[in-house]
Amino acid sequence: MAIVDTAIDGINYFLSLSLTQQITILVVFPFIYNIAWQLLYSLRKDRVPMVFYWIPWFGSAASYGMQPYEFFEKCRLKYGDVFSFMLLGKVMTVYLGPKGHEFIYNAKLSDVSAEEAYTHLTTPVFGKGVIYDCPNSRLMEQKKFAKFALTTDSFKTYVPKIREEVLNYFVNDVSFKTKERDHGVASVMKTQPEITIFTASRCLFGDEMRKSFDRSFAQLYADLDKGFTPINFVFPNLPLPHYWRRDAAQRKISAHYMKEIKRRRESGDIDPKRDLIDSLLVNSTYKDGVKMTDQEIANLLIGVLMGGQHTSASTSAWFLLHLAEQPQLQDDLYEELTNLLKEKGGDLNDLTYEDLQKLPLVNNTIKETLRMHMPLHSIFRKVMNPLRVPNTKYVIPKGHYVLVSAGYAHTSDRWFEHPEHFNPRRWESDDTKASAVSFNSEDTVDYGFGKISKGVSSPYLPFGGGRHRCIGEQFAYVQLGTILTTYIYNFKWRLNGDKVPDVDYQSMVTLPLEPAEIVWEKRDTCMV
């Protein structure tokens, strides 16, 4: 009763104060409590050092959100590779560098969870029952189902389809209209997301489905994409316009896929070797005998296309911008491409999947772009059990989060010489190649979707690692390589401005700040 009486006395005293005094206490007390909590937290020797912050709950969100890599480096210089910070009410523990990659990417499933970290963000976009809205074992099998469309035989058929889509885009899109003009200005943040959607849908979903994809459909995917922002990560559902557009886009795209799935089932028009949709209609039964529902298949199709769209749209936008700043590199790429085609006695229409493997500068340009601009600058996992940081006294509590940033290592001079320079030829160096190889890269592990390298202790991991490693790396290189060679064969281009745009970190994907434009002109070999 003494505690209750004391509490009542405290409330009565507070109510007896003037309004100004009450407001002052309500405003000041959270700050005092916040500072006191941080001081007490810092006394615990088993806790990772925390970056000091003034504003309760908000924490270091501004510094991290505006320039994450600069924030990480500043913290590293003060605390070392392991530190924590407050991000909108969540304690994030960061472990930088290859040891951090190993610690987080290869953490035990029982200790960390991507599903718990991301489901509230991804489920409104992809839909229920897939990706992070299901047990991890289900996700591993879903990745295996999707890999049926990512075989070498499939890639061989994708190259001419991608090339045709890009050439048609050059002819028909207002940014180019190459039948009507020889030069113009194109915004890469308009052209590349659309080209990515059109080429990926043609390859993965088939010719008939591609015909139903127009610019309005690309806009629906853009509306979905806007659901991947920091505010969505914290507040999955708010009564705001971009949330409404996200939900409307999800319903329309899902209904479109469901209509096609129903048509194929009713007509019996199913060939598992034709495209991903047919493959999933035939090969989507889990090991325990449960079959994916048609709605789950439709949702998985959204996830597959969205996952690839992030990487390829941002990467192709960035390599166009960097190449615009280096005309000599464009000429070197053109020479590499045309020399190969001369040996074949043909033109760009004769370029094959096998030929793409014989273009080292093309592939190194993609590789260098992914180094400088890893699409996702941070990857999160929620800690499910107390997690000890190797070779330290630190223990990360259950309920906190761990954060890995391969993109930080990509852009650090600790691992790459002059990391701020776009230099595809760095990958011709044996030293650079060696630095990007994991210590145990020859070891493999199968999480349920095929064998992958177990090693993640590398400073270069553009497609992630561990059980959540992206399965679309080879498809990305096919898609990006075909897009790049089609641009190089048909155009020269330069920046429509003084320099390559800065990175927009306000979204969760590292896109160029707009305006991001190139001025293009036809080459003599232009085909359209």
Curated annotation (Swiss-Prot):
It comes from Candida tropicalis (Yeast). Its main location: membrane. One of its GO terms (cellular component) is cortical endoplasmic reticulum. Pathway: Steroid biosynthesis; zymosterol biosynthesis; zymosterol from lanosterol: step 1/6. GO terms for molecular function: heme binding; iron ion binding; sterol 14-demethylase activity. Keywords: Heme, Iron, Lipid biosynthesis, Lipid metabolism, Membrane, Metal-binding, Monooxygenase, Oxidoreductase, Steroid biosynthesis, Steroid metabolism, Sterol biosynthesis, Sterol metabolism. Its cofactor is heme. Heme binds at residue 470. InterPro entries: CYP450_sterol_14alpha_dmase (IPR050529), Cyt_P450 (IPR001128), Cyt_P450_CS (IPR017972), Cyt_P450_E_grp-IV (IPR002403), Cyt_P450_sf (IPR036396). Its EC number is 1.14.14.154. Belongs to the cytochrome P450 family. This is Lanosterol 14-alpha demethylase. The keyword Oxidoreductase applies. It is found in: Membrane. It catalyses: a 14alpha-methyl steroid + 3 reduced [NADPH--hemoprotein reductase] + 3 O2 = a Delta(14) steroid + formate + 3 oxidized [NADPH--hemoprotein reductase] + 4 H2O + 4 H(+); a 14alpha-methyl steroid + reduced [NADPH--hemoprotein reductase] + O2 = a 14alpha-hydroxymethyl steroid + oxidized [NADPH--hemoprotein reductase] + H2O + H(+); a 14alpha-hydroxymethyl steroid + reduced [NADPH--hemoprotein reductase] + O2 = a 14alpha-formyl steroid + oxidized [NADPH--hemoprotein reductase] + 2 H2O + H(+); a 14alpha-formyl steroid + reduced [NADPH--hemoprotein reductase] + O2 = a Delta(14) steroid + formate + oxidized [NADPH--hemoprotein reductase] + H2O + 2 H(+). GO terms for biological process: ergosterol biosynthetic process. The keyword Ubl conjugation does not apply. Sterol 14alpha-demethylase that plays a critical role in the third module of ergosterol biosynthesis pathway, being ergosterol the major sterol component in fungal membranes that participates in a variety of functions. The third module or late pathway involves the ergosterol synthesis itself through consecutive reactions that mainly occur in the endoplasmic reticulum (ER) membrane. In filamentous fungi, during the initial step of this module, lanosterol (lanosta-8,24-dien-3beta-ol) can be metabolized to eburicol.
